[in-house]
């Protein structure tokens, strides 16, 4: 099993798809990495040679991925919260950050509905 950037890459997948298991690598970036490393994107991960894996690791090292990227994102959000910006407050309150409506919808960000207290007379 190939291990790149601390992640076990699924051996049955094509190189391009397997690289997307790494946080911060999508299809486009995976394809560019494979092309730069001279690896066919349709080649299965289990069929990659050690030299090819090493070239992929080398080209992947240029990008911020996995733990470093997660840390960078968390620090950006923390900075927004510390500055007291509108976006920071939305993050803090667990509401949508990019201007979406919240009167209805926004359930992903807000979580499951809470039952409203009924006022009986």
Swiss-Prot record:
Among Pfam families, the record links this protein to:
Ribosomal_S13
According to the UniProt record, one GO cellular component term is: small ribosomal subunit
Keywords assigned by UniProt?
Answer: Ribonucleoprotein, Ribosomal protein, RNA-binding, rRNA-binding, tRNA-binding
The record, for Gene3D superfamilies, names:
1.10.8.50, 30s ribosomal protein s13, domain 2
An annotated Gene Ontology molecular function: structural constituent of ribosome
Annotated region Disordered: the residues are 91-121
Official protein name in the record: Small ribosomal subunit protein uS13
Species of origin: Bordetella avium (strain 197N)
């Amino acid at each position: 099993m190939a291990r790149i950037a601390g992640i076990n890459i699924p051996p049955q997948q094509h190189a391009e798809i397997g690289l997307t298991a790494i946080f911060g690598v999508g299809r486009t970036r995976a394809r560019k990495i494979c092309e730069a490393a001279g690896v066919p994107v349709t080649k299965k991960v289990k069929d990659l040679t050690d030299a090819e894996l090493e070239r992929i690791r080398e080209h992947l090292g240029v990008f911020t991925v996995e733990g470093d990227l997660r840390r960078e994102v968390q620090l950006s959000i923390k900075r927004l919260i510390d500055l007291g910006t509108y976006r920071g407050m939305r993050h803090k309150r667990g509401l949508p950050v990019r201007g979406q409506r919240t009167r209805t919808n926004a359930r992903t960000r807000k979580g499951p509905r809470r039952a409203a207290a009924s006022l009986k007379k």
